[in-house]
Amino acid sequence: MIIRSLDLKDFTNYREESLTFHPNINLFVGDNAQGKSNLLDSLYFIATLGSGRSHTDRELVRWGEEGFSLSAAFSNRHGDHQLKIRGGKKKEVRIDGYDIQKKKEYIGYLTVILFTPDDLSLIKGDPSLRRAYMDQELAQTDVEAYVLQLRYRKILEQRNTLLKETWRHGFGQDMDAWEDQLVQKGTRILKKRLELLQLLAPLAQETHASISEGEELKVEYQSKTELEPLLEGREEEFMEAYRKILWKKREEDAQRGFTTRGPHRDDLNLTAGGVSLRKFGSQGQQRTAALSLKLAEIGYLKEKTGEY
């Protein structure tokens, strides 16, 4: 997978810039505040159709302009491609002359690994960051995983809305229906995440050992839902237990106003030498673990796509 060229117009601090890349290694050198990070963000954007730094496309538009454009020529295992993106008020994406209507249509064209100083929070930060790490990695190559994530969030919003209205209507058949969908989609998300870790965890462990004088890194999925039936292939048994948990938690969830069980509440447990890195790891250990996870992504994406 090689990006051959990139044209930027009105993207962050770039008025207009054209770049041609070497097929192997490229180094970007310059003074502070000259646009090195913005250039890297443009590369991240053409791979994911989103920024690694900004929350909205509008924030990426050069000051005083209405929108930005990115054009890239790249090659992957399927051949050569031309990409054109317009962003700002409305996003338009064209690949090889064809309009991309939904992000899922673009998944698999380009993959990217972003490593920044902020990735230390992947180890010591909120569990939501580690969940996002898993889901974003899956969504780079797996269309089904990406669609599942979108659908699960919508179903979760519906259940949470019903929970907040129980004082008025109680628990009715609508709750049963939404919970059934939540169980189905949630189970599939869990399976996807566990499959991801089956590949990623050993790679991270091997990398960590090589850069930390042999210290053992463990990456384990952490859930308040008993996963043993799912791990052993007893999916129906797991789903039935999942339904019962949601049913038992209805009163508590209604009081809190949100769903307290499910993959949206799970976490990764990262330990080195048997010690929790989030709670007790030194900053050096946390940085090494974050780097190990990021380097493991290289092997994972190679396994999934067949190319670097």
Report residues per predicted region.
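Post-Walker A helix-loop "phosphate-sensing" segment adjacent to the P-loop in P-loop NTPases
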Residues: 45-57, 296-305
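Conserved lysine of the Walker
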Residues: 35-36
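ABC ATPase nucleotide-binding domain signature
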Residues: 25, 43, 117-119, 274
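Conserved NTPase motor "head" modules and their coupling/switch loops across ABC/AAA+ ATPases, GTPases
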Residues: 1-31, 169-184, 188-308
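Nucleotide-state sensing region of NTPase/ATPase domains
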Residues: 47-129, 133, 138-145, 201-206, ...
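Long, charged N-terminal accessory/stalk domains
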Residues: 121-122, 128-169, 173-176, 180-183
